[in-house]
Each structure stands twice: as C-alpha cells, then as structure tokens.
Amino acid sequence: MMKNELGKPPEKSGNGDGARGRSVTRRGFVLRAVLVAALAALTAFGVGFAWFTVRVLSERPPSIYETDAIVVLTGGARRIDEALLLLAEGAGERLLISGVNPSTTPESIRKTTGGDSQLFECCVDFGYEALDTYGNAVETRKWIEEHGYRRVLVVTSAYHLPRGLFELRHIDPETVFVGYPVPLGEGAGPWYDNLRYVKVLGSEYLKFLGAHVRAVTGLRVLRPAKQET
C-alpha cells in the first residue's frame, strides 16, 4: 500500500501567474500610452501658445489702409479712441462701433472719447446686438451688406485681433478685413513679467482655439450671459 505524503503542498500551475503578468503588462502599456498622449497634447498646446503669443506681439498697424470703412470691436481700453482717430484721418468713410452696451447712448460715447459731434452725426454707427466676438462678426456682416463695403479696417486690442479676424473672415469670406491692433499698454517690461498680460494671452488663446472648434463643428456650446471683454 502506497504511503500518502501528508504536509507536502500541492504543485501550483503557472497559468495564474502568466495571466497576472499579462494583465500588468497591458496596464503598463495603457498607462504609457496615456502619458505619451498627454505629453504630446501638452507640447502641442505649448507650441501653439508660443506661436499665438509671437503673432500677437508682432502685430503692427498697416502702413497703407486702402479700406472703405472701419469697424471697432468694443471691450478693451482705447479701441474706440483709435477708431475715431482713424475715421478722422480718412481711413474709411464710416465707422461701426460693434457690441455697444444697450444702456450706453451715442452721446455718452462721444463725451467719453471727446469725439467731434459732426463726425459722430454723419459717419458713426452703433451696433447693440453683439454680446461676443462671434456676435461682432454677425453684426458687422449685416452692416457691410447694408453699405456694400468690400475692404474693412478692423480695430481691436492686439491680443483680440487674431480671433476677431478669424470670426469675421469665417462669417464673411467675401469681404477683405485688414487688422489694426491696439496695444494693451502695459508698459515697457517684457510681457512674461506681467502676470495680468500672461493671463490675458492664455485666456484669449483658449478662446481662439474654441472659435476654431466652433467653426469646424458648427456648434456653439455656450453663449455669454453678458458682453465679452
């Protein structure tokens, strides 16, 4: 009679260890893939932001306007003042101030800017419908169609100009839009030393990307509850 070997542990199959090893390998592969994708996205975002910043900082007013009219997109300091100076200099025959707050009257704008009353009466139009840059583009297109303009000078802050021109050209590809950047006026120091300017550029870059997404998808997920700045 064979002796039963008590106390000897049964031999384990290698199948369980192999399955666990393959599971760990798959998790490691997925984790590496996620990290690589995140790093690639972060790099692309950084490169895009650098390109956007260089574009904003290198924007200069055109040497020759050759434009029929002027539109100023409200929301930043000095935009309307610059547009009125350009109108007085003959850069266009009319000026549209797009995105005016409904509670603001033409006379209050004239007094604030110190504009000439005759110039306001003859040659300045006010748009009250736009709440954001997309709305500016829609409002401007209607105004252009009413007057039959072909070349329009667009006045807005330098950081806002890329998005403003993109929205206008997307909404109205038949019109030639010429950008006129208004400096932010933050002083002589480097832009990266000014935290407020860095935040403005970062926020505007995200909006710039959002405008491209909306143009491609045709979706407008969010509409602002108040006027954009």
Predicted segment positions?
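A transmembrane-helix-recognition feature enriched in membrane-embedded lipid enzymes
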Residues: 194-224
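Short, solvent-exposed mixed-charge patches
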Residues: 228-229
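N-terminal type II signal-anchor transmembrane helix
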Residues: 20-60
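Coil-to-alpha-helix initiation sites in intrinsically disordered, low-complexity, charged segments
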Residues: 23-28, 189-190, 196, 200, ...
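N-terminal Lys/Arg-rich, disordered targeting/topogenic segments
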Residues: 1-30
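Generic low-complexity, intrinsically disordered sequence content enriched
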Residues: 10, 43, 105-106
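A structural signal for short, hydrophobic/glycine-enriched beta-strand patches
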Residues: 3-5, 54-195
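Low-complexity, compositionally biased segments
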Residues: 7, 18-20, 84, 175, ...
